[in-house]
Amino acid sequence: MRTKDVPDAELAARAQAGDREAYGTLVMRYAAQARRVARAILGNPEDADDAAQDGFLAALRHIGRYDPDRPFGPWLVRIVANAAADRRRRRKVRRTEELSPLAAASAPGPGEVTDRRALRAALEAALAELPERQRVAVVLFDVEGYSHAEIAGTLGVPEGTVRSDVFHARRALREPLAAWRTWKERES
């Protein structure tokens, strides 16, 4: 069986036994997700990549602490989120760039590109105003597709707290995005 076809639990056990290739496979599986979470916290791809690398190295150093009865992905993403939060506290990084999951799949025309940039900027600004835990919860839930229970495990908070954070984040995002839609309709 090729390494990429091996279940997370088996790869994690092999990584705990010192198999770096197994750990590398796990990192590859969750790297994009981990980077998006780091970017939601930090706001730009360069800092997010650095925080993700910090988190991946910290997870490798502490692989022995991983509980094989729990999912590996949320464990790794939580470590990356903690690394991103540490980096943000140290550098006081502000969100300044676009959020990549919002990029469109098709090639848009110039007017559509401008509209998408304006929407992204409005969303970025609104996300930047949210408390960090709400921002991470709403990105994990609405962008990454995590369940409330998975987010609770990742963030180390009760599931009810996650539900509340997602609710309040969505409510906080609703007004700025509605204002953007109203502006867009007037422009049309």
Annotate each predicted stretch with a short phrase:
Residues 2, 16-25, 35-54, 188:
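Short, charged helix-capping/linker segments at alpha-helix termini
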Residues 16-17, 43-44, 54-71, 90-93:
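Sigma70-family region 2
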Residues 27-45, 62, 77, 127, ...:
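Amphipathic, Lys/Arg- and hydrophobic-enriched alpha-helical face
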Residues 124-128, 132-136, 140-161:
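Helix-turn-helix DNA-binding module
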Residues 61-68, 78-99, 116, 168, ...:
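Arg/Lys-rich amphipathic alpha helix in sigma70-family domain 2
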Residues 2, 116-129, 153-156, 171-188:
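C-terminal edge and immediately downstream basic/flexible tail or linker adjoining helix-turn-helix-like DNA-binding
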